């Protein structure tokens, strides 16, 4: 049959390395199909991209669009940008040299377990593999392949996992240990919005060093104070390489929160999405060991995790966090909505869809807080502009190109929170983005000064948000909220004005040398995954 391809782009493809626009230019408009569209689309998900044998360019893929104007199903065509190719296994556009499956037409189909059948196939407490063999229910989605066809690990999303966490039950989920709501928008203790402080969390992710410490000092000046008289605070998720640990020590001394962002900050999304328990343990618990020793953080205050590239590691990540006594994660994003979400605990099921391309959200119950990242609205004029996808890091809001746009962006998103349920407003930055435009830092500073002049707006750390949620306190009493009085007005000099410059090698990194700056004694070797303390342990 002859098929004319609908070239309207209805779903953009995510790029592995950067944001990109999908083009349909020069895609073939007509070609012969050996199968009907219905046959091609049988058993294919709406968001699955595949190739056709009739097309030769590795950039060209298609998906089944069941919302077309003509007929029940149509094919929607997309083309990756120049210099990129489409990886059907990972379902992303990537550099051509990294795509090794241009000859593959579609993502391999995994065998699914037989959860839904007309008649039960297994006795109570057991489920059927794809081949009909019955196994205990507890073996499904536990990270180990138990079925001969591996089907027990192939239906494990938040919506599919047979052992998933239950939906929110507010009678069982009670503060201070547990918080949930059916749609994620409920204010703790059902306070009225006008009696709820508007909390704003400013966070940075990455290395702390000479390139950004001046920026942090400017933003968090000593004289910038919340209405309770305490200096404003931020949260820093620190990666290891290129970090100056004496600078981290000073941030901690000033009362800012330090969290972990991994040791290696490895670029591969799959490494984080499908990482093993040991991968997450060495990366995050190891990063904490490095911070504790070389930034001299000895008060057990490093309790937060953010996954590199926000690639959540599923249940495995949260099992590690539970075992290692991490209190919260801040990697899961919630899609843009008219009313933002409050943070929640993972004892019960997430109150929103697992958002993002190929994300691996936790499906099981975990005693961990999720400091969910509400997407920000990046439209220049929300009243008239068409709907645009939200953004979680401010630096990923690619349409912000001028200081004026940034100013409107901050005010609009503040009002979205302030005028609805006052869920904490997260402003998540990479330092380099703020440095990229001379106006950005000034506009952010002006925004902070303006908001701290209100008696109901507080710039706090992630931990301080949790502390307030555990003991919800109305605005009339918030000035005396003791948990926000710690390190209220820190004065004095840094612990050391001239840190040690330690030039050390790493056997793990092929003998490469690095400079490590610390107020503490120098390590024998550069700390890395198998030797986070740098003691020079024997490597197997």
Where are the language model's segments positioned?
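Cysteine-rich, disulfide-bonded extracellular modules and peptides in secreted proteins
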Residues: 18-139, 143-157
């Amino acid at each position: 049959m002859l098929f004319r391809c609908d070239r309207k782009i209805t779903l953009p493809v995510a790029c592995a390395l950067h944001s990109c626009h999908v083009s349909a230019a020069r895609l073939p408009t007509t070609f012969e199909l050996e199968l009907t569209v219905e046959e091609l689309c049988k058993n294919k998900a709406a968001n699955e991209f595949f190739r056709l044998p009739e097309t030769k360019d590795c950039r060209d893929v298609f998906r089944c669009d069941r919302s077309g104007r003509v007929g029940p199903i149509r094919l929607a065509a997309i083309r990756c940008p120049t210099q990129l190719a489409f990886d059907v296994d990972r379902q992303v556009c990537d550099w051509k040299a990294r795509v090794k499956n241009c000859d593959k037409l579609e993502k391999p189909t995994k065998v699914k377990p037989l959860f839904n059948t007309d008649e039960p196939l297994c006795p109570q407490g057991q489920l059927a593999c794809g081949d009909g063999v019955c196994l205990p229910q507890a073996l499904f989605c536990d990270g180990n392949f138990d079925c001969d066809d591996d089907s027990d690990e192939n239906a494990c999303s938040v919506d599919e996992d047979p052992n998933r966490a239950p939906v929110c039950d507010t009678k069982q989920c009670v503060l201070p240990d547990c918080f949930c709501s059916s749609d994620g928008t409920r204010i703790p203790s059902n306070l009225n919005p006008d009696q709820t402080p508007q909390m704003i969390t400013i966070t940075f992710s990455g290395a702390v060093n000479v390139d950004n410490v001046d920026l942090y000092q400017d933003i968090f000046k000593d004289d910038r104070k919340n209405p309770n008289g305490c200096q404003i605070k931020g949260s820093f998720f620190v990666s290891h390489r290129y970090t100056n640990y004496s600078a981290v020590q000073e941030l901690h001394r000033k009362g800012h929160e330090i969290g972990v962002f991994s040791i290696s900050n490895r670029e591969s999304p799959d490494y984080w999405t499908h990482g093993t328990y040991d991968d997450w343990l060495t990366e995050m618990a190891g990063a904490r060991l490095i911070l504790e020793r070389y930034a001299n953080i000895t008060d057990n205050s490093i309790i937060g995790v953010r996954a590199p590239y926000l690639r959540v590691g599923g249940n495995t990540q949260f099992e590690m966090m539970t075992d290692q006594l991490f209190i919260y994660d801040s990697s899961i994003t919630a899609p843009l909505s008219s009313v933002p979400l409050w943070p929640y605990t993972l004892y019960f099921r997430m109150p929103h869809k697992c958002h993002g391309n190929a994300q691996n959200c936790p499906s099981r119950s975990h005693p961990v807080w999720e400091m969910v990242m509400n997407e920000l609205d990046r439209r220049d004029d929300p009243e008239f502009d068409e709907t645009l996808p939200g953004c979680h890091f401010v630096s990923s809001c690619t349409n912000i190109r001028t200081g004026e746009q940034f100013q409107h962006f901050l005010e609009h998103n503040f009002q979205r929170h302030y005028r609805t349920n006052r869920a904490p407003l997260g402003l998540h930055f990479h330092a380099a983005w703020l440095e990229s435009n001379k106006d950005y830092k000034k506009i952010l500073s002006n925004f902070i000064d303006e908001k701290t002049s209100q008696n109901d707006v507080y710039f706090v750390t992630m931990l301080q948000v949790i502390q307030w949620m555990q003991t919800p306190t109305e605005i009339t009493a918030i000035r005396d909220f003791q948990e926000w009085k710690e390190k209220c007005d820190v004065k004095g000099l840094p612990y050391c004005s001239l840190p040690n410059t330690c030039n050390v090698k790493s056997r793990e990194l092929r003998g490469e040398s690095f400079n490590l700056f610390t107020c503490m004694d120098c390590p024998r070797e550069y700390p890395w995954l198998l030797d986070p303390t740098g003691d020079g342990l024997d490597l197997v």
